[in-house]
């Protein structure tokens, strides 16, 4: 009886380790199925504020968007596949959250050469932080709108917004509880 329980436990640990390796390679495998290299060289970074319920353990207030809750920070490749992810309370700035996401996932970002960000990531401190984490060869590009109060789809920026839409479509992620 004891031996069977021990074998069962060891088997579960092996399966968990196998699953961990498997999930880490999902993005690379998906990119290879599309005929691309497993590692991306260009990432698009953005953040999204999401409402919390009143009983949630972690929450903050994003004064810019007037949302009480959390903030999701993601860096996706040109196909919309996530390469770096971080979840913070809403008061964390986009720049700090993006640096946290890149720091968490830096081992898988060794071949990245450029980041495309919106105007929320402007500033030399952010660029220096990215270069400290990923290397001096990284270029940070800021996508700017040409006209102040008009809607215009910005090339490549819509990809990260589509990735957020994929997350929102998952009913378990529509509100952080």
Residues covered by each model-derived region:
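Short alpha-helical elements
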Residues: 1-177
């Amino acid at each position: 009886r004891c031996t069977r329980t021990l074998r069962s436990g060891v088997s579960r640990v092996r399966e968990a380790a196998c699953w961990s390796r498997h999930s880490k390679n999902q993005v690379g495998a998906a990119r290879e199925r599309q005929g691309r290299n497993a590692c991306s060289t260009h990432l698009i970074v953005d953040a999204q504020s999401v409402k919390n319920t009143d009983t949630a353990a972690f929450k903050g207030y994003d004064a810019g968007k007037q949302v009480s809750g959390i903030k999701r920070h993601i860096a996706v490749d040109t196909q919309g596949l996530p390469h770096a992810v971080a979840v913070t309370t809403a008061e964390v700035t986009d720049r700090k959250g993006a640096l946290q996401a890149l720091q968490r996932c830096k081992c898988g970002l060794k071949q990245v050469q450029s980041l495309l960000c919106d105007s929320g990531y402007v500033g030399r401190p952010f660029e220096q932080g990215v270069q400290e984490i990923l290397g001096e060869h990284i270029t940070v590009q800021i996508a700017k709108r040409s006209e102040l109060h008009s809607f215009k789809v910005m090339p490549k920026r819509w990809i990260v917004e589509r990735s957020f839409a994929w997350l929102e479509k998952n009913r378990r992620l529509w509100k952080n509880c």
